[in-house]
């Protein structure tokens, strides 16, 4: 049986991990075993973070809509339920952008819902 030299394969495998570990501190970027552990941990955190980002932005939008609705004398839950009854198809992201950037349009939507 012939001998298989794995130098290039092993080097490429380690280089791939070290490339992902770029920007880490200390042994986490220099030593292969710790770098690999930290890369796996970072990838796990980034996966969870992508899921969390959706929740966080939805909470932010709801907070902004609630604050703008409170300024006009209506709370968030009644505002959203009134939007549903009127069949106004504006999502929370759009409403939050209206509430923060274009308050006149938001007030128009709120008045439409109130009546």
From Swiss-Prot:
InterPro entries: Ribosomal_bL20, RIBOSOMAL_L20_CS, Ribosomal_protein_bL20_C. GO terms for molecular function: rRNA binding; structural constituent of ribosome. Its main location: plastid. SUPFAM superfamilies: Ribosomal protein L20. GO terms for biological process: ribosomal large subunit assembly; translation. Pfam families: Ribosomal_L20 (PF00453). Keywords: Chloroplast, Plastid, Ribonucleoprotein, Ribosomal protein, RNA-binding, rRNA-binding. It is found in: Plastid, Chloroplast. PROSITE patterns: RIBOSOMAL_L20. One of its GO terms (cellular component) is chloroplast. The keyword Ribosomal protein applies. It comes from the Eukaryota. CDD domains: Ribosomal_L20. Binds directly to 23S ribosomal RNA and is necessary for the in vitro assembly process of the 50S ribosomal subunit. It is not involved in the protein synthesizing functions of that subunit. Belongs to the bacterial ribosomal protein bL20 family. PANTHER family: 39S RIBOSOMAL PROTEIN L20. This is Large ribosomal subunit protein bL20c. It comes from Pyropia yezoensis. The lineage of its organism: Eukaryota, Rhodophyta, Bangiophyceae, Bangiales, Bangiaceae. The gene is rpl20.
């Amino acid at each position: 049986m012939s001998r298989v030299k794995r130098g290039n394969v092993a080097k490429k495998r380690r280089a791939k991990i070290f490339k992902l570990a770029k920007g880490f501190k200390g042994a986490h970027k220099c030593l292969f075993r710790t770098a690999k552990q930290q890369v796996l941990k970072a990838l796990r955190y980034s996966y969870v973070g992508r899921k969390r980002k959706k929740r966080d932005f939805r909470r932010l939008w709801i907070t902004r809509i609630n604050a703008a609705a409170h300024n006009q004398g209506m709370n968030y839950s009644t505002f959203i339920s009134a939007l549903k009854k009127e069949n106004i198809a504006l999502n929370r992201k759009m409403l939050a952008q209206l509430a923060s950037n274009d308050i006149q349009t938001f007030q128009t939507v709120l008045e439409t819902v109130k009546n």
